[in-house]
């Protein structure tokens, strides 16, 4: 998975 967390 490739998630960009703020």
UniProtKB/Swiss-Prot annotation:
Q: Which GO terms describe its molecular function?
A: DNA binding
Question: What is the top-level taxon of the source organism?
Answer: Bacteria
Question: Which keywords fit this entry according to its UniProt record?
Answer: Activator, Amino-acid biosynthesis, Aromatic amino acid biosynthesis, DNA-binding, Transcription, Transcription regulation, Tryptophan biosynthesis
GO biological process entries: L-tryptophan biosynthetic process
Keyword Transcription in the entry? The reply is yes
Q: What does this protein do?
A: Activates the expression of the trpBA genes encoding the two tryptophan synthase subunits. In the absence of the inducer (indoleglycerol phosphate), TrpI binds upstream of the trpAB operon, overlapping its own promoter region.
The family note in this entry says: Belongs to the LysR transcriptional regulatory family.
Name of this protein: HTH-type transcriptional regulator TrpI
State the species of origin: Pseudomonas putida (Arthrobacter siderocapsulatus)
Q: Gene name on record?
A: trpI
